[in-house]
Amino acid sequence: MKQSLILAVLCLALVFATIEAKPKADPNIIVGGCIKCHVKNASGRCVRIVGCGVDKVPDLFSDPNIIVGGCSKCHKQDSSGNCVRIAGCGVDPVRDAE
């Protein structure tokens, strides 16, 4: 009786130790060579995935690494596939007046 009780306690301890040994969610987990919520672009640079993580609504004004449609911050692709600047985005009032 004593041996089976000790065996049961040891089994429970092993189960709890296994559960605790599982890795926790790591905000810096590496996916494809980049940190969480980032991917490598064509030039091999890690860029942020729009809408990933706590920023559910893309904030074009605060994150310089946000990529929208393959273009960098404050730029979008035109019908030819070229990246063109979005007027009013960022802080360049001189260019916006053009």
From Swiss-Prot:
Q: Which residues form the propeptide?
A: 22-27, 63-64, 92-98
Residues annotated as signal peptide: 1-21
Supply the alphabetized keyword list: Disulfide bond, Nematocyst, Secreted, Signal, Toxin
In terms of domain of life, where is this protein from? Eukaryota
* SS bonds (residue pairs): 34-46, 37-52
For this record, the Gene Ontology CC terms, alphabetical, are: extracellular region; nematocyst
Instruction: Provide a Gene Ontology MF annotation, just one.
Output: toxin activity
Locations listed in the record: Secreted; Nematocyst
**Family recorded in the similarity comment:** Belongs to the sea anemone BBH family.
Which protein is depicted? Peptides MS9.1
Species for this entry = Metridium senile
